[in-house]
């Protein structure tokens, strides 16, 4: 029974550390990562784990997720209510504050085949880097509220200090089993923790002593360096520092992260620091320099060094009635302490005394520490008479030995006088620092280097003057730490008083609302009030002079966080009231991902709202919001429209039409004027697109005239995707083919809404996927680019922006039985092309009594067609012979011979036994090939071909075209392909597979399967694979070829090689050495 209770407690602890629950298959692994054991459900009498979990409803709550997975949640009890509250208050990026914010853009990289970094041409002296450091990405930050001052709260997760093992003396939970990864070096733990995060168990009261594990000798110097650094930090903060703030100062001073485990060791480092627990009982503690009672010792001249004053009276707690300590014992204690220059804990004195003198230390002397005060200095911790540190007294000249109490009192008076002088000196230094504060230069704000940083939009006066704040560890998080320190400094420092004289431009510390302390700069002054700008928030406010204080220099090291930017694409309309209002309503007070186009003093940016399922381009959205509504087509239900032009027909049957209206007439007039303008005026470089970005509207010359297009995706500096605003077509073009709209027509051109209207044929089933090629071709031949068609609107879907219409050709208008809708339903092509089902009776879909709408009834011909759809595809693939002959394959890519080096890039890595490399020298040719394939296949006619396994094709994967090997054909219309240049396996629609033309068969396939040499392992664990991937995937490395295994098919070639990371400044890291060391450490743990 005790075992069952123990398992229940541990299970609740595991579940409580996961706010969002744990899926059932992962529960055993999470339990074992914390306890070292599996859940013994069979020993407890249950056949399955789920049966055991359902037997303890007071511990586990089981629910089914939307995807059908079983998820386990913790059930709080009285004992663990406090823990549940703490977990609920965790500040993570998933917590909703106002709305959920995803600060990571889902927008794909403009050029996924673009590589960052370059391997070095030659290797330095090979060697294994034991202090391999790994950078970790900071967590996303959160929006917080500071009254009128907008703020950002970040959850900063400090990574472990590299290669710093921590020797713990503190107690641990009885059920906290030894974790395999706890004994690995920090460089390994960093990678493992990404897949197996360490969980914290707060639910156990029983404790046992953890064995004292001595760190390896190679780490001793590292620990000494950490201790010396902490001592330097404390020397700069004589008044103490909160332990929770120490990692921030450590990172700021030494540009390294402090291992969180070090924070638990301070009580055992009396020679480094003194720890005091505040009386309030909070979780945080204060940290002081060691031997704080002698603040002036290091500041005095060694030749004039004063003797140490006696301990303060409050530290001497004599024990009445205790026997006196023998003089010989005191002499031995003084001699013993002389060997401990950093002090000795009183509890350790008996053991050290006995080890040195082979004599037992008197027990009464330990109970009466005050009796030893004449031979040592006693520093009581938190007033506890049983917890103290003993320091040896410095030897004094015999003529100055203190013999009586009066002399001691006089010496105490000297100490008090020195302390007063020290405080006065500190005050004078603070005042002098204030006098020279105006000469201090605050460092400029550095634009983040990451691809899509997050920003908080504060306010704007126009679109060229938008005030933002960057969100992140080095920005909003650092600012919040600084503000907490400001609050502590100004609230608890009695010497700080409001400023008396002020002048414009002066920096201040302002006591704002909710007792917040913010940095500000004076804009203007009045008799009793001053107008300040909060330099970290970007807004202004009139405040009383009594709330303004001098800004201490220590708070000037962080850059002003409020900065300005310009919204790309809105420059010409930057002060338009409607535009400013639209931008303000969509952006102010919200966090966005930002694409920085130009990193100038005022950056040019594009904002993306990533809080929903799709990323929304805010710049483009605001531009469309201010279009002239009077120039937009307003279709009415049951209305008839003539002279309609069908401009585009999609493969799913969707139509785009142009309906005559005022906006279309004005657009055509403007485009004619633009044509004349370009014809008469010499085309200069100012009209070429120098900075393409998504959402930009420009001109493209097509079929002898200029058309409006919007950039939808930037592949590279040469190729991009555009959508024709007024026809609905999409294509890929070269950047050099686009032109800027002339300034004289720009404002009018932007005011005209898109003239392409999205339509669907009424009474035909919707959302059925692709139509057959024959059906789409028939529809295109019938109505595409016909300028005198007619439509009748039957329904408007405002949410989707779709009009449901009957479509008529000129000869059939207005007979509904001869509409395109009826013709396509009754056409003979559906009898032999059964990829799509259509309702033969139009009234059934629109009848009020038909609840299924356009869905065919079971047993109907349409339902039969739907069921036969996969078989039809499979049969057509097998029966039809390809009309395109297979060209010869390109030669295999060149690889270095055995024993030679080559520069490589690793696009994909599974484990050391299987990964993919690309020769670095050939990558620029692959980039050019990718661009050319995008441009070619985006404008070429889609061909319906019969595909075969193990043949080479071109396939479209996520808007880009790749050279692929077809590996398999599925029955649901999908095919499995292998990217021959990148080594990835993908599933694509069979319609996205096209013949690979001869011009794209000349470059050798770039992906080569590889195996890491120098390591022997038959089966790689998930953790080992993760470590390997983190070291090599998407990195440029140097390879030393051992063996090349040739094959007739270039995609079956294999190379066995060594990999070397040369990115570190002082050493080369051989990956096989690193993995061998990892396996060795793991085997020791197991």
Curated annotation (Swiss-Prot):
Region described as Interaction with CABLES1: 881-1086
Domain HTH OST-type span(s) in chain numbering: 3-76, 222-291, 325-394
Record-linked InterPro entries: LOTUS-like, OST-HTH/LOTUS_dom, SNase_OB-fold_sf, TDRD7_LOTUS_3, Tudor, Tudor_domain_containing, Tudor_TDRD7_rpt2, Tudor_TDRD7_rpt3
GO MF annotations, alphabetized: mRNA binding
Disruption phenotype: Mice develop cataracts and glaucoma and males are sterile. Within 4 weeks of birth, mice develop a posterior cataract that becomes severe with age. At later stages, the lens fiber cell compartment develops vacuoles with lens capsule rupture and extrusion of fiber cell mass into the vitreous. In addition, the mass of fiber cells passes through the pupil into the anterior chamber of the eye. By 4 months of age, iris flattening is detected and anterior chamber depth increased.
GO CC, any one term: ribonucleoprotein complex
Biased composition (Basic and acidic residues): 295-306
Localization (cell): Cytoplasm
Region annotation (Interaction with CDK17) ranges: 849-1086
Residue span of region Disordered: 295-324, 844-866
Entries under Pfam families matching the protein: OST-HTH (PF12872), TUDOR (PF00567)
Keywords: Cataract, Cytoplasm, Developmental protein, Differentiation, Phosphoprotein, Repeat, RNA-binding, Spermatogenesis
Family: Belongs to the TDRD7 family.
The protein's role, per its UniProt record: Component of specific cytoplasmic RNA granules involved in post-transcriptional regulation of specific genes: probably acts by binding to specific mRNAs and regulating their translation. Required for lens transparency during lens development, by regulating translation of genes such as CRYBB3 and HSPB1 in the developing lens. Also required during spermatogenesis.
Protein name per UniProt: Tudor domain-containing protein 7
Source organism (scientific name): Mus musculus (Mouse)
Lineage: Eukaryota, Metazoa, Chordata, Craniata, Vertebrata
């Amino acid at each position: 029974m005790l075992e069952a209770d123990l398992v229940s407690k541990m299970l609740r602890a595991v579940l409580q550390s996961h706010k969002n629950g744990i899926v059932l298959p992962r529960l055993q692994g999470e339990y074992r990562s914390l306890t070292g054991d599996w859940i013994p459900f069979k020993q407890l009498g249950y056949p399955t784990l789920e049966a055991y979990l359902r037997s303890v409803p007071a511990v586990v709550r089981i629910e089914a997720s939307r995807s059908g997975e079983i998820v386990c949640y913790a059930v709080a009890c009285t004992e663990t209510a406090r823990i549940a509250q703490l977990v609920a208050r965790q500040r993570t990026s998933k917590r909703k504050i106002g709305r959920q914010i995803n600060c990571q853009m889902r927008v794909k990289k403009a050029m996924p085949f673009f590589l960052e970094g370059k391997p070095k041409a030659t290797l330095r002296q090979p060697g294994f880097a034991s202090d391999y450091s790994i950078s970790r990405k900071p967590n996303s930050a959160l929006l917080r509220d500071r009254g009128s001052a907008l703020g950002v709260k970040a959850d900063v997760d400090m990574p472990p200090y590299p290669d710093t093992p921590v020797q713990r003396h503190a107690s641990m939970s009885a059920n906290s089993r030894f974790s395999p990864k706890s004994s690995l070096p920090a460089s390994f733990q960093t990678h493992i923790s990404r897949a197996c995060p360490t969980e914290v168990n707060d639910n156990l009261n029983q404790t046992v002593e953890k064995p004292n594990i001595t760190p390896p000798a190679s780490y001793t110097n590292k620990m000494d360096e950490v201790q010396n650094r902490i001592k330097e930090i404390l020397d700069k903060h004589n008044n103490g520092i909160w332990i929770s703030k120490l990692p921030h100062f450590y990172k700021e001073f030494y540009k390294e992260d402090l291992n969180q485990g070090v924070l638990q060791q301070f009580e055992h480092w009396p020679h480094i620091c003194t720890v005091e627990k505040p009386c309030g009982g909070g979780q945080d503690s204060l940290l002081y320099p060691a031997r704080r009672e002698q603040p002036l010792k290091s500041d005095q001249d060694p030749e004039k060094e004063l003797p140490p004053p006696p301990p303060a009276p409050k530290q001497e707690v004599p024990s009445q009635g205790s026997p006196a300590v023998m003089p010989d014992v005191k002499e031995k204690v003084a001699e013993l302490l002389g060997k401990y220059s950093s002090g000795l804990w009183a509890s350790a004195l008996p053991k050290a005394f006995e080890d040195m003198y082979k004599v037992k230390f008197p027990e009464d002397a330990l109970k009466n520490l005050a009796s030893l005060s004449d031979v040592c200095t006693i520093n009581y911790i938190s007033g506890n008479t049983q917890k103290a540190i003993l320091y040896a007294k410095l030897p004094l000249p015999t003529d100055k030995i203190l013999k009586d109490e009066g002399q001691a009192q006089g010496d105490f008076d000297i100490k008090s006088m020195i302390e007063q002088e020290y405080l006065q000196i500190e005050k004078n230094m603070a005042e002098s620092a204030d006098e020279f504060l105006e000469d201090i230069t605050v460092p400029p704000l550095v634009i983040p280097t990451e691809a899509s940083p997050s920003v908080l939009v504060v306010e704007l006066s126009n679109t060229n003057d938008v005030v933002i704040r960057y969100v992140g560890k080095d920005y909003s998080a650092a600012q919040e730490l600084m503000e907490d320190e400001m609050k502590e400094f100004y609230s608890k420092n009695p010497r700080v008083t409001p400023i008396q004289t002020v002048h414009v431009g002066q920096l201040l510390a302002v006591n704002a609302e909710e007792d917040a302390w913010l940095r500000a700069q004076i804009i203007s002054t009045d008799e009793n009030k001053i107008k300040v700008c909060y330099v970290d928030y970007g807004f202004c406010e009139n405040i009383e002079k009594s709330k303004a204080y001098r800004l201490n220099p220590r708070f000037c090291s962080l850059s002003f966080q409020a900065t300005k930017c310009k919204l790309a694409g809105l420059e010409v309309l930057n002060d338009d009231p409607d535009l400013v209002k639209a931008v303000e309503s969509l952006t102010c007070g919200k966090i966005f991902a930002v694409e920085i186009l130009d990193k100038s003093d005022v950056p040019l940016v594009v904002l993306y709202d990533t809080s929903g399922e799709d990323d929304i381009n805010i710049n483009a959205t605001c531009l469309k919001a201010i279009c002239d509504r009077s120039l937009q087509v307003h279709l009415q239900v049951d209305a008839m429209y003539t002279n309609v032009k069908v401009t585009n027909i999609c493969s799913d049957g969707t139509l785009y039409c142009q309906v005559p209206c005022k906006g279309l007439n004005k657009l055509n007039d403007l485009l004619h004027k633009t044509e004349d303008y370009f014809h008469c005026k010499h085309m200069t470089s100012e009209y070429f697109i120098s900075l393409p970005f998504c959402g930009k509207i420009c001109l493209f010359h097509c079929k002898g005239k200029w058309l409006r297009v919007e950039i939808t995706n930037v592949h590279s500096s040469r190729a991009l995707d555009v959508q024709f605003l007024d026809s609905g077509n999409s294509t890929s073009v070269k950047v050099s083919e686009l032109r800027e709209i002339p300034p004289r027509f720009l404002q009018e051109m932007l005011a005209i809404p898109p003239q392409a209207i999205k339509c669907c044929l009424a009474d035909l089933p919707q959302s059925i996927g692709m139509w057959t090629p024959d059906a789409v071709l028939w529809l295109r031949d019938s109505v595409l680019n016909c300028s005198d068609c007619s439509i009748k609107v039957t329904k408007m879907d405002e949410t989707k922006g779709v009009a449901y219409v009957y479509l008529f050709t000129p000869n059939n208008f207005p007979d509904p039985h001869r509409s395109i809708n009826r013709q396509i339903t009754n056409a003979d092509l559906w009898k032999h092309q059964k990829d799509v089902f259509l309702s033969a009776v139009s009234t059934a879909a629109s009848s009020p009594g038909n609840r299924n709408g356009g869905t065919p009834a079971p047993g109907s011909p349409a339902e039969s067609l739907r069921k036969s759809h996969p078989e039809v595809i499979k049969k057509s693939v097998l029966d039809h012979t390809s009309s395109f002959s297979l060209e010869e394959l390109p030669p295999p890519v060149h690889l270095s011979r055995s024993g030679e080096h080559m520069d490589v890039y690793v696009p994909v890595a599974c484990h050391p036994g299987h990964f993919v490399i690309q020769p670095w020298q050939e990558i620029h040719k692959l980039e050019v090939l990718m661009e050319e394939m995008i441009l070619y296949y985006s404008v070429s006619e889609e061909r319906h071909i019969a595909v075969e396994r193990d043949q080479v094709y071109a396939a479209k994967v996520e808007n880009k075209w790749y050279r692929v090997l077809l590996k398999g054909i599925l029955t649901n219309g999908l095919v499995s392909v292998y990217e021959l240049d990148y080594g990835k396996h993908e599933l694509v629609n069979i319609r996205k597979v096209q013949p690979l033309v001869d011009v794209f068969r000349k470059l050798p396939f770039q992906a080569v399967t590889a195996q890491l040499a120098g390591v022997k392992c038959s089966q790689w664990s998930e953790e080992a694979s993760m470590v390997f991937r983190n070291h090599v995937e998407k990195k440029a490395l140097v390879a030393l070829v051992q063996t090349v295994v040739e094959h007739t098919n270039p995609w079956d070639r294999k190379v066995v090689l060594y990999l070397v990371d040369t990115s570190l400044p002082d050493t080369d890291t051989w990956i096989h050495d690193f993995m061998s060391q990892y396996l060795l450490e793991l085997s020791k743990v197991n």
